[in-house]
Amino acid sequence: MRLILLVLLATWQVVVDTRAPTFPDKLTQQLQQQGTTEPQGDHVCTVKTIVDDYELKKVIHTVVYNDTEQCLNPLTGFQCTVEKRGQKASYQRQLVKKEKYVKQCCDGYYQTKDHFCLPDCNPPCKKGKCIEPGKCECDPGYGGKYCASSCSVGTWGLGCSKSCDCENGANCDPELGTCICTSGFQGERCEKPCPDNKWGPNCVKSCPCQNGGKCNKEGKCVCSDGWGGEFCLNKCEEGKFGAECKFECNCQNGATCDNTNGKCICKSGYHGALCENECSVGFFGSGCTQKCDCLNNQNCDSSSGECKCIGWTGKHCDIGCSRGRFGLQCKQNCTCPGLEFSDSNASCDAKTGQCQCESGYKGPKCDERKCDAEQYGADCSKTCTCVRENTLMCAPNTGFCRCKPGFYGDNCELACSKDSYGPNCEKQAMCDWNHASECNPETGSCVCKPGRTGKNCSEPCPLDFYGPNCAHQCQCNQRGVGCDGADGKCQCDRGWTGHRCEHHCPADTFGANCEKRCKCPKGIGCDPITGECTCPAGLQGANCDIGCPEGSYGPGCKLHCKCVNGKCDKETGECTCQPGFFGSDCSTTCSKGKYGESCELSCPCSDASCSKQTGKCLCPLGTKGVSCDQKCDPNTFGFLCQETVTPSPCASTDPKNGVCLSCPPGSSGIHCEHNCPAGSYGDGCQQVCSCADGHGCDPTTGECICEPGYHGKTCSEKCPDGKYGYGCALDCPKCASGSTCDHINGLCICPAGLEGALCTRPCSAGFWGNGCRQVCRCTSEYKQCNAQTGECSCPAGFQGDRCDKPCEDGYYGPDCIKKCKCQGTATSSCNRVSGACHCHPGFTGEFCHALCPESTFGLKCSKECPKDGCGDGYECDAAIGCCHVDQMSCGKAKQEFEALNGAGRSTGLTWFFVLLIVALCGGLGLIALFYRNKYQKEKDPDMPTVSFHKAPNNDEGREFQNPLYSRQSVFPDSDAFSSENNGNHQGGPPNGLLTLEEEELENKKIHGRSAAGRGNNDYASLDEVAGEGSSSSASASASRRGLNSSEQSRRPLLEEHDEEEFDEPHENSISPAHAVTTSNHNENPYADISSPDPVTQNSANKKRAQDNLYT
């Protein structure tokens, strides 16, 4: 029994130990990542640099401590003391040098505040922008490397001596004199306005506007009525109309809206301004303006006006049904026999189709003969004379022979001729007898000759097919265009020959089947397809006798010269450059200060460029003289100082070019000839309008000019409720409650479920949403949906978002939300509309839960087996009746019934056994717990006492360690320690033990501490011990908690590092002299453990020690 209890105790200890929490190492990293200022985008280069960084170094300290382990000594409570070593880790921060790659702008680029790299031009571009390092792109009217020079308005050329000849306010290029057209004009002199599909200066920009839209000067599309979008590509959607599709239609009953003027176009059958009224009886068509013209009391369709004739046909119901036809438009065939024969007297009612029998027939369908098949006559005494194998029947009243298709004659003894077929050969075959051999005597279909097809053999075989009925496929390759429909011979493309078109034309031949001869001069070949002569380099023409024109070269002169400033060789295309240019394509000009054919001559100018062809100096603005070494005199400016300052409205002008430097408020331009651009106003147009997007402002004062529907100082406020239009001056109509008025055009905006000009009508059936413009998407025939949400209301038997899914098995009713109560699919099926159970044969009851009574079977148990039984080896099955017992289906209904009833019984037995097993397990657990507690109460171990001795030379290891205690104590004050051990416990327990009352008080103080840190471990962290104090009373109180901790739960705490070791020491942290860092057991200053005399031991302390040992 004791051995069993020992095993149970060991098992319980393992469970407790495995549940003890572990403590992973905690590292505190105090380095913060610097915010990045590196550039981004294009022109970014990566370089290597050296930076400072920090690394953490781990330092390990050895710790010796006492611990307890499980053993077989019952006198110590199966716990023995052992000495163990552990390690504690700390971390230090070290400075290291590391290589790092950083990003910076490439050479020639600088970094902006937004961290992008832009090209750098030095000196900066004066009248332009820098597009590459050291390269400027000048504004219109300026030139030079840094865009610093320009002729005065209206002049150009050397010395600005030439006058511009431009119109419509255009200026000209100061160097070339070409007109620089303002936006909206083009032509050599800017005399032509831009066509509708162009815009911008010189009309070089294509207008992207479509569908009749036009561009304004800024290139923005102004769409025509019925179109919208940025480029007028979007046709007004249904329900919108007008310019930019700003207005809404209110048409009803599926009418469409003219997207240009908003007029409703009614569907046939409706009329009214909004197509809200149906046509009256007797009228039809769009607008219900047309009157029905049906005869014989027949009605017409309100949409199409088509007459709905029953028993009649014809456009106006004026023609009676032909023999054998009845119903709507006489489209239905009567089923009475004999109608297919012309000599038959059978007929049917034109409206109902009821048969009217001829003589010799009887029955509701007139399909029963009065006489036998070979007899006829009133008394069936006469014998038919028809050829039996060619005859359909012998008329029972007259003996007339009705022949099979393909035969004729009084007795059906004659076959049809080549071109006739059908009953009595009355039908004529429609074959093309030039291409047909015969026709089918029954169907009349034509039998075609090889190479022909079609209903009457009038069509040739399709491409790539040939033979009788075009049944064979041609074997030509991709260079053939088909084959002969009769024999399959391939017809080759031009330039090819051979049985399968696999060979090129021989030399000097071309065309289809290579039948033509080339007509080129001797030694010159021709194209095998067209026959054109293939000319050598430098020649062209039909006979290759014409030289290449200027700008082309090579064979047939088909290559274009690439010489920009020169001419090319007619054969090789090599360029011969003009003076001042060089390079393979003559596109490179002489460098600055050089001119001439080879750019070898130096310009004789002073800090100026010269003509690349003549070497003449081109003086910059503000200079003159042959070498451009003289400055302009006062009151002159421009090229060669030929311009004089003239009076102007400008406040000041540039002394170099006469351009206005300061324009009056509200104007801009080099002569203040333009108003401020949109969005700006004031002096120099430098101030920005404060108006909301889409609203302009006065160029002088900046006052906002609001668009319709807005008001306020910045035009940012919409019109108040009840107002709309310019200045919000117009009153909205009285829209119905819940609807709003459009602040721009004043139209009522209906909420979901309402429609009409004033939103007063609910949505018509089948429509929903705002303005009732959306069609219900329900597939049900009722087309019913919620007028606000469009959610479909499904009829009984259907479900799904569109009511297009039938109910799943076991459910029924509207939206299939009701669950069927039938017994199961083996015995019944459930009606998805009503939920009624339809019992399978052999079952009965409201829910098909019972077998048919004995001796009954079938659907609803309506049939009965013989009263005297089914016989030997047979039985009465509830589903199929009498059956042999070995038959597979015999007894199947009874098996299904028993399976359904047996499932409930097996489920009950399963639950019974589950509960029985749980009860047995619980009883065994209670027995084991009872014997464990009994064994613990029989044990009466001695409670060890603890005494403390100061270590004289090792303050570093001053720590309390006892394996029966749940935390360590550190005593930085040796005097206090000594006084505690010298008997300063008057009237109390010796050696620091507490009385029962003191222990309860101490437990209240420490209540709430972490069980993971104290309750299940022998050691606490050093910081916690130092903060809590080091009295022997606290240590003694701690000894009454957590006797059974394992080494696994203790070791992580020994290796736990202090977070404060990365920074300066904390004011409450323990100095190295107080840390548990000894490696010599002989010098260990820990307390000695001894066992006192049991007689002198306080009985209360003894009882508590005993409880602590096992709990």
UniProtKB/Swiss-Prot annotation:
Residues where Phosphotyrosine is found: 1019
The EMI domain, residue ranges: 41-113
GO molecular function: scavenger receptor activity
Free-text note on domains in this protein's UniProt record: NPXY motif thought to be involved in signal transduction that activates the cell corpse internalization process.
Major location category of this protein: membrane
Native organism: Caenorhabditis elegans
Gene (UniProt): ced-1
Subcellular localization(s) per the UniProt record: Cell membrane; Cytoplasmic vesicle, Phagosome membrane
Pfam families from the UniProt entry: EGF_laminin
GO biological process, one term: actin cytoskeleton organization
The FU repeat ranges on this chain: 629-680
Name of the molecule in the record: Cell death abnormality protein 1
Cleavable signal peptide: 1-18
Disulfide-bonded cysteines: 45-106, 71-80, 105-117, 121-130, 125-136, 138-147, 160-172, 166-179, 181-190, 203-215, 209-221, 223-232, 245-257, 251-264, 266-275, 425-439, 431-446, 448-457, 685-697, 691-704, 706-715
